[in-house]
Amino acid sequence: MQLTSFTDYGLRALIYMASLPQGQMTSISQVTEVYGVSRNHMVKIINQLSRAGYVTAVRGKNGGIRLGKPAQSIRVGDVVRELEPLSLVNCSSDFCHITPACRLKQALSKAVQSFLMELDNYTLADLVEENQPLYKLLLVE
């Protein structure tokens, strides 16, 4: 299974924010600069993460974005569920004539659930805490 760039950059944005000192604000521009992604794309991602409570956005002169909850309470599997369309095949009867007898959808569904259950074993904190090489790459002190 390959994650969409939307989910990939959503996870990267959260990793960046989790690497900062707790509560420190950053900006969408800073995140886009670190990862080399378009600002418009990142704005859409941050908006969805904000609606889901993973990011807090503060407007104004001293505003910015930061994690909306502690890194240790954000499970990677939950973020993927929020951002990723998880339907691996199009099983509409108009599209596929074997849908009534097909067992592939069930097998793929079980595989996706196993994938997500494994990701649920990791929090953002697990990915960033005591990860000096990551801090160096992200230019975080």
Curated annotation (Swiss-Prot):
One BP term from GO: negative regulation of DNA-templated transcription
Cofactor: [2Fe-2S] cluster
Cited InterPro entries: TR_Rrf2-type_CS (IPR030489), Tscrpt_reg_Rrf2 (IPR000944), Tscrpt_rep_HTH_NsrR (IPR023761), WH-like_DNA-bd_sf (IPR036388), WH_DNA-bd_sf (IPR036390)
Keywords carried by this UniProt record: 2Fe-2S, DNA-binding, Iron, Iron-sulfur, Metal-binding, Repressor, Transcription, Transcription regulation
The record's free-text note on cofactor binding: Binds 1 [2Fe-2S] cluster per subunit.
Any one Gene Ontology molecular-function term assigned to this protein's record: iron ion binding
A family per Pfam: Rrf2
GO CC annotations, alphabetized: cytosol
DNA-binding positions: 28-51
Residues engaged in binding [2Fe-2S] cluster: 91, 96, 102
Domain HTH rrf2-type: start-end pairs: 2-129
Function: Nitric oxide-sensitive repressor of genes involved in protecting the cell against nitrosative stress. May require iron for activity.
Listed name of the protein: HTH-type transcriptional repressor NsrR
